[in-house]
From Swiss-Prot:
Protein name per UniProt: Beta-mammal toxin Co3
Key words of the record: Disulfide bond, Ion channel impairing toxin, Neurotoxin, Secreted, Toxin, Voltage-gated sodium channel impairing toxin
MF terms (GO), sorted A to Z: sodium channel inhibitor activity; toxin activity
Primary residence: secreted
Amino acid sequence: KEGYIVNYYDGCKYPCVKLGDNDYCLRECRLRYYKSAGGYCYAFACWCTHLYEQAVVWPLPNKTCN
């Protein structure tokens, strides 16, 4: 599974500036999911890869980013 890492509180994606390989996104994806997850910056938000099927990613139901 893949998807944008999401803030559970406000429903927003984790923003990033440096597109492509990005240490911040990789670190955040691994902290949120687990160490075998990958992550990079895509369309100015952190995209996580190699997630388990039950992983919660953007968009969250009933939560819009404010």
